């Protein structure tokens, strides 16, 4: 690496005003390289949805991907829960899961309300991010194990992987930024994002997954998000002709990144306590890719759409995340969400990318007439 990894992390944290950032990578059997800014390398952060690959590994160790759930209709199978293709919405109608308490029955109480979740489409039709699927998968895995979800994950995944610093305890520092939240993480949400961990432990988790029996099934493509593909608990993309798998996380002022390059036996982990931390980590990821694959990620090229093509997407879209107002503007679309306004340019016939500003690189698309997908979640047009 021409520039030291520590220097890359320092520059990324400064550019995005991130209070604390820890990152590291390992390649093959070599010693891991770690860096930290504003914290120690071994500081535990909330990893949020980086929990999902570990939940998926647990579920696949206990459940058949083709079996029904017993909670949603029988056309919804375990594989749909783990691939965000269940057709169900992301959250319960009443989103505050703290109401289920902190007892061992919290996840079961949550699962009992899952029949009330809005069904958007039939399973397998369109990929739409759904935490609800992971709560149900975690509940089913716990039932099959005859234990709480936390105990099942610890005994079957965390302990065998040697993740001594990974747990459901609160992180070692607070989240910051517009998305920061006070109070504890709801126990019922834990299968979708409840773990706290360190960079070193996530590198060990990556090595464990690469060698695991479940990893091959986790890489079978089941859905297509706005960019790349999704297997069971892992996003996938190709970079320089090489497959890259992983997951990001975002919750309560923490953002995280976890990447696996199987052909190079390489693992990357990045943790921040900032609501814009993912943008800083993107720069650090590029340094990792340059080192391992010889090139960073490339932003897709923009394409030209006619005014008539752009007009087909204009309107107000709604989901339980809010209103998404879309207007035609210049060569692209103007997206308004709450007090935020972003110009996005087309990178495909139905896909748009924000080229600059605090949300640079974010994408949204329109997978079907009358449906938009914002932040990975489907929204219906009025």
Residue ranges and their predicted role:
Residues 282-382:
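Peripheral terminal and inter-domain segments
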Residues 2-48, 65, 115:
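Short, conserved catalytic-motif segment at the N-terminal edge
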Residues 37-38, 274, 320:
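A generic structural motif
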Residues 44, 66-67, 75-79:
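Alpha-helical scaffolds flanking conserved acidic
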Residues 257-275, 373-377:
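Short, well-ordered beta-strand elements
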Residues 25-27, 238, 337:
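Residue-level signal for short segments within beta-strands and strand-turn junctions
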Residues 16-19, 30-32, 72-256, 260-262:
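Short, surface-exposed loop or secondary-structure junction motifs
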Residues 6-9, 23, 46-65, 137-142, ...:
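Active-site SXXK
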